């Protein structure tokens, strides 16, 4: 009788552990980002439909529910340079509060990892969705539309109130879009 009870407890413990492992794997960080986020710079340019250099002029907490565990924020942008797509002077993107960008190893996108497949300075929320954060007053090279990648919302350093003209990513995108 005692042996039977111990076996039941052991089975129950094993089942509980396995269930816990299965559930916890789904609640962990994004282990395998979607394939469409893992592109090369050339692939990103080929897929682009709307590209602008824009400055963040407003960040407003959104009434949308918090997704990915972080509160939603509406960011309003003023277009500084329109590079591709339908020209607009302003647009709004919904992102999230809290940092989603690791510190850059270079301020002008000259670091090698940025240029690799899947490179960029943005990372996913635990549900594998990109919800970028932005800083009011700063410039960004924005690729709007699908697919959003880790390079779709890159900060471009501000030099004397303007986007850095020597930024490698910005220069690359401008050159490639002229050739399209």
PLM feature spans:
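Bacterial N-terminal signal peptides
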Residues: 12-22
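Transition segments tied to proteolytic processing and entry into folded domains
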Residues: 25-180
């Amino acid at each position: 009788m005692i042996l039977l009870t111990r076996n039941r407890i052991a089975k129950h413990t094993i089942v509980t552990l396995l269930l816990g492992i299965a559930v916890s794997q789904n609640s962990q960080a994004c282990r395998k980002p979607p394939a469409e986020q893992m592109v090369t710079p050339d692939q990103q340019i080929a897929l682009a439909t709307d590209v602008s250099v824009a400055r963040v002029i407003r960040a407003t907490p959104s009434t949308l529910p918090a997704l990915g565990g972080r509160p939603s924020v509406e960011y309003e942008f003023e277009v500084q340079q329109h590079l591709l797509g339908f020209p607009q002077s302003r647009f709004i993107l919904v992102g999230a509060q809290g940092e989603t960008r690791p510190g850059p190893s270079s301020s002008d996108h000259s670091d090698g990892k940025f240029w690799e497949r899947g490179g960029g300075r943005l990372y996913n929320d635990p549900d594998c969705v990109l919800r970028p954060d932005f800083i009011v007053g700063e410039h960004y090279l924005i690729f709007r539309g699908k697919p959003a990648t880790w390079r779709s919302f890159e900060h471009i350093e501000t030099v004397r109130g303007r986007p850095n003209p020597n930024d490698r990513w910005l220069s690359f995108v401008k050159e490639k879009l002229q050739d399209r």
